[in-house]
Amino acid sequence: MPVAVGPYGQSQPSCFDRVKMGFVMGCAVGMAAGALFGTFSCLRIGMRGRELMGGIGKTMMQSGGTFGTFMAIGMGIRC
């Protein structure tokens, strides 16, 4: 697929750049959601201190990676 040229001679981002941008945006949104849901679920089962921070971090990484992967796939389909 040829690269489209926008106004003022600017080129559009490549397909790989779009997929990469989708992954980063998905990671950011997924980690924010994971922080909220992870905090709630860890506090609900009674975690405190280091265990709480580990549980929240684990949930943030899992949800960030999952949502980032799906966003990257979605951006790849749109290329």
Swiss-Prot record:
Q: Which domain of life is it from?
A: Eukaryota
Q: In which tissues is it expressed?
A: Up-regulated in a number of cancer cell lines when compared to a normal lung fibroblast cell line. Highly expressed in brain tumors.
Q: What induces it?
A: By the anticancer drug fluorouracil (5FU).
Q: One cellular component GO annotation, for this chain's record?
A: mitochondrion
Q: Where in the cell is it found?
A: Mitochondrion inner membrane
In the record, what terms sit under GO molecular function? Answer: monoatomic cation transmembrane transporter activity
- Give the membrane topology, semicolon-separated if more than one: Single-pass membrane protein
Q: What does the record list as GO biological process? A: antimicrobial humoral immune response mediated by antimicrobial peptide; cellular response to reactive oxygen species; cytolysis by host of symbiont cells; defense response to bacterium; defense response to Gram-negative bacterium; defense response to Gram-positive bacterium; intracellular protein transport; killing of cells of another organism
Q: Keywords for this entry?
A: Antibiotic, Antimicrobial, Membrane, Mitochondrion, Mitochondrion inner membrane, Transmembrane, Transmembrane helix
Annotated membrane-spanning segments are 22-44
Q: Which Pfam families match?
A: Romo1 (PF10247)
For the region Sufficient for antibacterial activity, give the residue spans.
42-60
| Family annotation (InterPro entries) | Romo1/Mgr2
The family annotation for this protein states: Belongs to the MGR2 family.
What remark does the entry add?
Enforced expression in IMR-90 cells leads to increased levels of ROS and induces premature cell senescence and nuclear DNA damage.
Function (record text): Induces production of reactive oxygen species (ROS) which are necessary for cell proliferation. May play a role in inducing oxidative DNA damage and replicative senescence. May play a role in the coordination of mitochondrial morphology and cell proliferation.
What is the designated name of this protein?
Reactive oxygen species modulator 1
